[in-house]
């Protein structure tokens, strides 16, 4: 998540630098920036922050150029600004869809983790016990169902942990992040990440 996210920001900044010189190669950097931001989101939905930062920068740039080009009636330059908006929509969608399809291709066997999915979804998994009368889900149906289930699971989680931090405490590093623990009868060892 962190690697993909910061790589996307780095590539976006490189794109901005090339784009100021009107270099067409900047679009390749923008595309890779969006791909890596989507990879960060694919790892964990909090990675959406990286895509959000890039999106806000692109939208602000688009609005600035839209106002300038609308007054001057330079349609050619408006088309390039509009292309960035299309890239902002389609590259993340196609990347995220591809990552989920890869995920579903790797995890193709039935097990205890799929009990919360529909029988049509489970029917697509190897080793399922679903009857013959159930029609298997298509890839797009599985994609939609998986994302709805992930969202519902996260939205309805009410449990807390005594060491949990509030969202506004994250940038301030008020509480450490617990990475690893090992103990035996006489000793215990822990690894925490504590900010500066």
Label for each model-derived stretch:
Residues 8-29, 40, 58-69:
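Membrane-interface transmembrane helices that cradle and orient dolichyl/undecaprenyl
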Residues 12, 56-60, 64, 94-102, ...:
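Alpha-helical membrane-inserting segments
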Residues 2-3, 31-32, 46-64:
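Transmembrane-embedded, aromatic-rich helix segments that form part
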Residues 96-173:
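Aromatic-rich transmembrane-lumenal/periplasmic boundary elements in polytopic membrane proteins
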